[in-house]
Regions:
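HIT superfamily nucleotide-processing domains
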Residues: 1-140
Length: 140
């Protein structure tokens, strides 16, 4: 755990860009406050590692299972045509994956999703509304 890391420290650091949706076995799911892609989330590992190879096989499998659970919830709640998956970590050295719902003929369809955290930022009430929808879809 690194208390200078937004995902480890949680609180104010992660609140700048994310809103906690729920805890899963191997990760925490955050709604990305910038919602130019409705339903965009981040699945952050509970382990402070930079690379998938730093996780044990069991931890890696559990993390991927959380990603799949979250993707299923996105499809159920938002009905995207495609979910894009992105793992970068050049500047934030904590394993996390962006799940970005994409909709045919809408914003950035056919291209890479942007990382502009101020494009279409939701307030706390709007975040909770979307998070509640995701929580319900995750619970099944």
């Amino acid at each position: 755990m690194d208390m200078n890391c937004a995902y480890c420290a949680k609180g104010e650091l992660v609140a700048k860009f994310g809103y906690e949706v729920c805890e899963l076995p191997a990760s925490t799911v955050y709604l990305f406050k910038e919602q130019s892609h409705p339903g965009r989330v981040i699945v952050a590992s509970k382990h402070h590692v930079s690379e998938m190879i730093e996780l044990s096989q069991e931890e890696r499998s559990a993390f991927i299972e959380d990603v799949v659970t979250t993707a299923n919830a996105l499809h159920k709640a938002f009905h995207p045509d495609k979910v894009n998956y992105g793992m970068y970590g050049d500047t934030g050295h904590h394993l996390h994956m962006h799940l970005v719902p994409k909709y045919k003929d809408e914003f950035e369809w056919g291209g890479t999703f942007a990382m502009d955290p101020n494009l279409k930022k939701l307030d706390e009430a709007q975040c909770e509304e979307v998070a509640a929808k995701l929580r319900a879809a995750i619970k099944g």
